[in-house]
Amino acid sequence: MAEITAAMVKELRESTGAGMMDCKNALSETNGDFDKAVQLLREKGLGKAAKKADRLAAEGLVSVKVSDDFTSATVSEINSETDFVAKNDQFIALTKDTTAHIQSNSLQSVEELHSSTINGVKFEEYLKSQIATIGENLVVRRFATLKAGANGVVNGYIHTNGRVGVVIAAACDSTEVASKSRDLLRQICMHIAAMRPSYLSYEDLDMTFVENEYKALVAELEKENEERRRLKDPNKPEHKIPQFASRKQLSDAILKEAEEKIKEELKAQGKPEKIWDNIIPGKINSFIADNSQLDSKLTLMGQFYVMDDKKTVEQVIAEKEKEFGGKIKIVEFICFEVGEGLEKKTEDFAAEVAAQL
């Protein structure tokens, strides 16, 4: 069995919000596997999904460059050693110049970047000179570029603190619609920076993942219901336990069954059949909303729009399609956050945690 260290317990606790001993037991039961321990805690209703932000440790900046014709959008991340340098004007200029260089030369990898020429010298030498001037080690960690296809459009957004950047691409059915969609795409990028969706739509979700998340969702709701029953607060009724977690699970047969059940309810209520067609669509939409909580949490199209939280991003786009007179299909988005995926530095907390175990 893997050794369960105090640092492992602390990381799991910070990521899930679960209790110290619950985290230790979960790690023991899963032989030290962090992701399995998270899932186990969630299935027991003891913790929330681990957030990527909980593991961020690096300093630096994310930069975004969108071409003047909105056909190319590049996002890059350059790491520094301290937050102080990340606010340095020369470092900020370096990130912008590097991103523009990547885009104008259609570079595809960090290796290709280091071999390229900027201002008459190899980029590798240029970066070394910047390191010598700024006084800290600097690393171009990653970058990506999205290109617009025929009748396509791209845009981007960089959060004011430079720690989060987003680029997005959409396919439209005319250049006119593509041009009209520029501001919409920037606003959707702002939404992505705020809400951090992990997927574009429910269609991108893996069914096994959905099924596991459903178990965790039910456990979480049942745990909350248990507490609400104990408190007996009339202003906090029990949660309704959904049958499903995502539209990925809602087959035509399931939707048809839901529709038939709605018809039976309308008949029992004595509603005349001539008005059923006006009632059923709204009730079906409510059924879908109740049974797609995972989509509203993890998928861009299923999330409620930050600028109008009564509508999903999908609904906002549909409205804009009618306004612009054409189709708008989000093809891809990329969101970078400084330090995402890097391990935290080890601090002197092990003894403190060990004393509590």
UniProtKB/Swiss-Prot annotation:
Keywords, comma-separated and alphabetical: Cytoplasm, Elongation factor, Protein biosynthesis
Origin: domain of life: Bacteria
Gene Ontology MF terms in the entry: translation elongation factor activity
UniProt-annotated stretches for the region Involved in Mg(2+) ion dislocation from EF-Tu: 82-85
Subcellular location: Cytoplasm
GO cellular component, one term: cytoplasm
Principal subcellular localization: cytoplasm
Protein task: Associates with the EF-Tu.GDP complex and induces the exchange of GDP to GTP. It remains bound to the aminoacyl-tRNA.EF-Tu.GTP complex up to the GTP hydrolysis stage on the ribosome.
PANTHER family: ELONGATION FACTOR TS, ELONGATION FACTOR TS, MITOCHONDRIAL
Family as reported in the entry's similarity comment: Belongs to the EF-Ts family.
Name under which the protein is recorded: Elongation factor Ts
